[in-house]
């Protein structure tokens, strides 16, 4: 794990971040996601997929955040001011893995194992 500038720490236990333009171009990156254009492309594909969800499935609902959950870390993806923010967050605190619930209505995808993972 790389050390990041304190200014770029968006959340506690953050181990990486990407900031993208709406078209997927990487504006900034750091930590485990430093210069990770592959992950940026995968996430843009996921975001494009969410735009094709049938309105009758989720009427009058707008996705505010996507969480991709793994055993030891998770990704939180949101959009603000025409930028896409992707944060990789460790579930460990002082070497102890904590568990999180992903039953939130904002959670779109949950995969607890790394075996079929797209982002790892």
From Swiss-Prot:
<feature type="region of interest" description="Disordered">
    <location>
        <begin position="93"/>
        <end position="120"/>
    </location>
</feature>
<dbReference type="GO" id="GO:0032008">
    <property type="term" value="P:positive regulation of TOR signaling"/>
</dbReference>
<dbReference type="GO" id="GO:1904263">
    <property type="term" value="P:positive regulation of TORC1 signaling"/>
</dbReference>
<comment type="function">
    <text>Regulator of the TOR pathway, a signaling cascade that promotes cell growth in response to growth factors, energy levels, and amino acids. As part of the Ragulator complex, may activate the TOR signaling cascade in response to amino acids.</text>
</comment>
<dbReference type="GO" id="GO:0071986">
    <property type="term" value="C:Ragulator complex"/>
</dbReference>
<dbReference type="GO" id="GO:0005764">
    <property type="term" value="C:lysosome"/>
</dbReference>
<comment type="similarity">
    <text>Belongs to the LAMTOR4 family.</text>
</comment>
<dbReference type="GO" id="GO:0061462">
    <property type="term" value="P:protein localization to lysosome"/>
</dbReference>
<dbReference type="GO" id="GO:0008361">
    <property type="term" value="P:regulation of cell size"/>
</dbReference>
<dbReference type="GO" id="GO:0071230">
    <property type="term" value="P:cellular response to amino acid stimulus"/>
</dbReference>
<dbReference type="InterPro" id="IPR034601">
    <property type="entry name" value="LAMTOR4"/>
</dbReference>
<protein>
    <recommendedName>
        <fullName>Ragulator complex protein LAMTOR4 homolog</fullName>
    </recommendedName>
</protein>
<feature type="compositionally biased region" description="Low complexity">
    <location>
        <begin position="97"/>
        <end position="107"/>
    </location>
</feature>
<keyword id="KW-0458">Lysosome</keyword>
<comment type="subunit">
    <text>Part of the Ragulator complex composed of Lamtor3, Lamtor2, CG14184, CG14812, and Lamtor4.</text>
</comment>
């Amino acid at each position: 794990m790389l050390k990041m500038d304190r200014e770029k720490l968006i959340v506690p236990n953050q181990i990486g971040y990407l900031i993208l333009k709406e078209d997927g171009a990487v504006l900034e990156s750091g930590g485990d996601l430093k210069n990770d254009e592959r992950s940026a492309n995968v996430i843009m594909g996921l975001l494009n997929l969410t735009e094709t969800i049938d309105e009758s499935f989720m009427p009058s609902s707008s996705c505010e955040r996507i969480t991709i959950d793994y055993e030891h870390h998770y990704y939180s993806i949101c959009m603000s001011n025409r930028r896409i923010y992707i944060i990789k967050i460790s579930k460990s605190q002082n070497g102890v893995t904590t568990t999180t619930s992903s039953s939130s209505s904002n959670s779109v995808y949950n995969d607890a194992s790394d075996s079929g993972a797209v982002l790892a």
